[in-house]
């Protein structure tokens, strides 16, 4: 386990497009939060960055900050080498603030692997997204409350999460979550409904055809419907999909199923699962 000494770590990335190639033109970091080198698993049009947190977990009092800027017509994909672990706390709160900005025509894919909250963890997560005209944002988030593989449940602790998405300055998505371990709210239908894993996929851009959504929903339910609950909703400018269950592995398959289906329609390119997800 990581040291009990609180850490402050910040990472700032900037991507720009030139002659059809997306490059990482700025990479600044302070503390143990970094990107080793840009990757191009599907050609030079898409730049992939794997964000690494060497300590391997976040302890009470730690503060992480990530800022990503995608320039006009650039395409960046941000992922992680493994699950992010938030360790138990004796009182202090660990924090993470993510700010993502895509300029006109830019594409930003936010695809970290699972987030695991250990029992007694106290965590505050801020996630802000700013999108300019004709930009596209896709995100996949898998939250695991307790280490279910070890028979651990989230009986104590507190998780707070604020998520906002703005398109051309207009707020199109806002979600505020506050969960106390072992509380009645965790069993409520408006929260986790007694489940230990919550996964969310969000995509901005033009609405998908109704037939395409029906096909995506059918396949997602086939994968996750027996062990959990799957829902997909097309809003005016956002597609939102959710999975509630008790298996992070099933949640991963459901999220990737949805991503594989909508990425070719929206971006005109197949979904290539980040290599780090397969290790």
Swiss-Prot record:
Q: Which compartments does it reside in? A: Cytoplasm
> Care to name a GO molecular-function term for this sequence?
nickel cation binding
Cross-referenced InterPro entries: UreD (IPR002669)
At the top level of its lineage, which domain of life is listed? Answer: Bacteria
Pfam families membership: UreD
Q: Which GO terms describe its cellular component?
A: cytoplasm
User: What main location does UniProt list?
Assistant: cytoplasm
Q: How does it assemble?
A: UreD, UreF and UreG form a complex that acts as a GTP-hydrolysis-dependent molecular chaperone, activating the urease apoprotein by helping to assemble the nickel containing metallocenter of UreC. The UreE protein probably delivers the nickel.
Explain the purpose of this protein.
Required for maturation of urease via the functional incorporation of the urease nickel metallocenter.
Kindly provide the name given to this protein in its UniProt entry.
Answer: Urease accessory protein UreD
**From which organism does this entry originate?**
Nitrosospira multiformis (strain ATCC 25196 / NCIMB 11849 / C 71)
Top-level taxonomy: Bacteria, Pseudomonadati, Pseudomonadota, Betaproteobacteria, Nitrosomonadales
């Amino acid at each position: 386990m990581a040291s009990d000494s609180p850490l402050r770590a910040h990472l700032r990335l900037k991507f720009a497009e030139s002659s059809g190639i997306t490059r990482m033109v700025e990479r600044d970091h302070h503390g143990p939060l970094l990107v080793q080198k840009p990757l191009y698993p599907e050609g030079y049009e898409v730049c992939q960055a794997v964000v690494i947190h060497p300590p391997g977990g976040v302890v009470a009092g730690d503060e992480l900050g990530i800022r990503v800027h995608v320039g006009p017509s650039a395409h960046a994909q941000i992922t992680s080498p493994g699950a992010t672990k938030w360790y138990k706390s004796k009182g202090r709160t660990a924090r993470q603030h993510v700010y993502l900005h895509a300029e006109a025509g830019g594409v930003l894919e936010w695809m970290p692997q699972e987030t695991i909250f250990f029992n007694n963890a106290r965590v505050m997560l801020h996630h802000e997204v700013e999108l300019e005209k004709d930009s596209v944002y896709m995100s996949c988030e898998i939250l695991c409350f307790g280490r279910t593989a070890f028979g651990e449940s989230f009986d104590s602790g507190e998780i707070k999460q604020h998520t906002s998405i703005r398109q051309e300055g207009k707020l199109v998505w806002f979600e505020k979550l506050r969960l106390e371990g072992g509380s009645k709210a965790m069993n409520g239908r408006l929260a986790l409904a007694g489940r230990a894993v919550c996964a969310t996929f969000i995509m901005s851009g033009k609405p998908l055809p109704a037939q395409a959504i029906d096909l995506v929903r059918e396949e997602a339910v086939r994968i996750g419907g027996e062990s959990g609950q799957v829902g997909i909703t097309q809003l005016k400018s956002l597609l939102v999909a959710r999975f509630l269950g008790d298996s992070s592995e099933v949640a991963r398959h459901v999220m990737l199923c949805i991503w594989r289906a909508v990425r070719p329609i929206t971006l005109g390119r197949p979904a290539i699962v980040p290599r780090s997800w397969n290790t």
